[in-house]
């Protein structure tokens, strides 16, 4: 049986005072004009790194990028992405609809909302104890 912490979860992984060094997870759609196998990209790390990386990617490679998910203060963004991969691996309803390589994710436009939902569900699991 899983218990939920609810509001107390804020103290479970105390927030750092400096927002710039808080961990963060961002998922964006590259939104390029060319056909790409991997239309989505995940960035994970400290907020200061994410801000710089997003600016550089937008100015140099993906000027029309669309941020689909931005989770501030995600205690373990690397773990979140690995759990996404675990969730889809070996499950026929997901495995045939998603591909990934490194931080790149490929899926059909029809599955985009499911992908965002999966990441949100995985993020919500931080409240389970």
From Swiss-Prot:
Pfam families: DUF3627. This is Uncharacterized protein 029R.
């Amino acid at each position: 049986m899983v218990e939920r912490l609810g509001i107390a979860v804020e103290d479970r992984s105390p927030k750092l005072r400096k927002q710039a060094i808080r961990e963060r997870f961002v998922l964006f759609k590259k939104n390029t004009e060319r056909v790409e196998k991997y239309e989505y990209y995940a960035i994970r790390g400290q907020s200061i790194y994410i801000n710089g990386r997003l600016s550089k990617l937008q100015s140099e490679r993906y000027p029309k990028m669309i941020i689909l998910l931005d989770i501030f203060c995600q205690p373990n963004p690397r773990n979140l992405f690995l759990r996404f991969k675990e969730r889809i691996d070996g499950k026929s309803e997901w495995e045939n609809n998603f591909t990934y390589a490194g931080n790149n994710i490929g899926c059909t436009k029809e599955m985009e909302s499911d992908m965002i939902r999966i990441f949100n569900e995985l993020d919500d699991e931080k409240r389970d104890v």
